[in-house]
């Protein structure tokens, strides 16, 4: 499978989606189902890191599938961080946010590296702890 899904930390607050090489819509759909299976037994909110630092161009139709995945996310989803420096992926993300999810610009962000993704989420989690 060109998309691997796993917990990124032992606290089970971050899911890591690792996109490798060329991947297909069917693999994206399977990964989304796997995320739902992982999160069905937890009672807290999660972040998702989409690690696209080592993948090729997204398949045709990904915006529609990403929209479906976003609509299915539910209450447990706190936000997503896309790790990539691929200009095409960044442009598609911008199109997705403008067309399907303009109100969620703060919930979906892009960074260049996995380190930046984890740093951003850690900062967001600290903010949540401070406000509760």
Model-derived regions, located:
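Amphipathic, Lys/Arg-enriched alpha-helical "gate/interface" segment within cytosolic domains
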Residues: 1-132
């Amino acid at each position: 499978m060109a998309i691997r899904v796993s917990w990124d930390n032992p606290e089970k607050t971050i899911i890591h989606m690792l996109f490798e090489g060329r991947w297909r819509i069917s693999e994206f759909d399977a990964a989304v189902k796997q995320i739902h299976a992982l999160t069905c037994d937890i009672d807290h909110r999660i972040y998702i890191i989409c690690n696209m630092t080592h993948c090729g161009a997204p398949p045709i139709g990904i915006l529609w599938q990403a929209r479906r995945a976003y609509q299915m996310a539910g209450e447990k989803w706190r936000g997503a961080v896309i790790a990539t420096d691929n200009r095409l992926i960044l442009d598609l993300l911008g199109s997705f946010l403008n067309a399907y999810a303009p109100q969620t610009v703060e919930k979906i962000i892009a960074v260049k590296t996995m380190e930046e993704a984890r740093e951003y989420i850690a900062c967001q989690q600290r903010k949540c702890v401070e406000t509760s």
